[in-house]
Design a protein with these regions (language model features):
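Structural signature of hydrophobic alpha-helical transmembrane segments
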Residues: 55-67, 116-130, 179-194, 240-251, ...
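Internal transmembrane alpha-helix with an interfacial aromatic "cap," most often the third helix
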Residues: 109-112, 132-145, 163-176, 191-208, ...
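Surface-exposed interaction/gating patches
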Residues: 168-169, 173-194, 200, 215, ...
Length: 331
């Protein structure tokens, strides 16, 4: 999701000889895998889909999170200047939200096995998401940003706050924390249109996006998808509103997926394209939760999205393995 311009300040800092810097945005893969795992576990409960698929995806998401978490801590220890530069740059700063979102999504998978661990992870993720949204939005209000520095990743801090209520039912914190869920929805309702307007202005008036940022546009579909799930899980008395917000997410996917498919043909696979996975998986989960009100069409939509998201994640996994293999051979 970071362009060459965005990585310039980071690349200019010193690094250890032979070391390879792993950007914070790689936690986006954890987001996609964890949400798709949740979708398959829901499919097991609703349609008797194979439980093993969801379990394997959940294990992969947890292992990847641990690996990336350890790598991030190592980089803070050995390359602090480089990490600080990444966390401070206007284009990469919002991507830090992928870490907090991962911490908010993993409790959905952990809660049935270890409620205490799930609640601890959720608490860290919720505090981190709120603090980082406050910090990031404050930095935008101070100005001095260029149109070229705006990209769809600017929505990630907003999505982070919206994700806070998702695990509340699994953690058995409804209705105790229902006001927090209402705050998250209102936060998203306020800031999603504002940031989306900036992103559309960047697309209409700015230069073409670099290859690494092409998939980031699909983040525009994430806020309505997450909001629809929150409405169904925490505010079930508003089924039509949840269904309408889901349809908005589907519309945005239909609008943006063909554009990504067209623009990405001329480029090699980018690890940053994992950005595709979370909006697709989040919309899939929202469609599954709204199936009782969508009728047969809603069921078909949920199954279609589950198949599409699974296929996309499979392609992303294969592409990532190829990149890893090439990198290993190059060394």
């Amino acid at each position: 999701m970071m362009s060459a311009a965005s990585t310039a300040p980071v690349a200019s800092t010193s690094a250890l000889p032979g070391s390879r810097f792993v950007p914070i945005e790689r936690f986006g893969a954890v987001m996609g895998l964890a949400t798709l795992a949740h979708a398959w576990l829901l499919a097991h409960a609703q349609y008797h889909a194979p439980w093993l698929i969801g379990a394997l995806l959940a294990a992969l998401a947890l292992l990847l999170f641990v690996a990336l978490g350890l790598r991030t801590l190592w980089q803070w220890w050995r390359m602090p200047l480089r990490v600080r530069a990444e966390w401070a740059h206007p284009q990469s700063k919002p991507l830090v939200g992928t870490l907090w979102i991962s911490l908010l999504l993993l409790p959905l998978l952990l809660a049935p096995a270890n409620m205490l661990a799930a609640r601890v992870l959720w608490g860290i993720g919720a505090l981190g998401a709120l603090a980082w949204a406050w910090h990031t939005l404050g930095s935008w209000l101070r100005g001095r940003h260029r149109l070229a520095s705006i990209n769809a990743a600017w929505l990630i801090p907003v999505v982070g706050v919206l994700d806070i209520p998702l695990a509340l039912p699994a953690l058995r914190w409804v209705p105790a924390l229902t006001p927090l869920a209402a705050f998250a929805l209102l936060f998203g309702a306020l800031f999603t249109p504002l940031v989306s307007t900036l992103i559309f202005a960047r697309m209409a008036l700015g230069r073409a996006l670099p290859p690494a940022q092409l998939a980031a546009l699909l983040i525009l579909a994430a806020p309505p998808a997450v909001a629809s799930s929150v409405l169904r899980l925490v505010f079930p008395a508003l089924p039509m509103l949840a269904l309408g917000v889901l349809l908005l997410a589907v519309f945005l996917l239909v609008l943006l997926l063909p554009q990504f498919a067209r623009d990405s043909r001329a480029h090699d696979f980018e690890a940053a394209w994992w950005t595709l996975s979370f909006p697709l998986a989040a919309t899939t989960v929202a469609a599954q939760l709204n199936t009782p009100w969508g009728g047969f069409a809603g069921l078909c939509l949920a199954l279609l999205l589950l198949a599409l998201t699974s296929a996309v994640v499979a392609v992303l996994l294969l592409g990532s393995l190829r990149l890893f293999w090439r990198g290993s051979r190059a060394r």
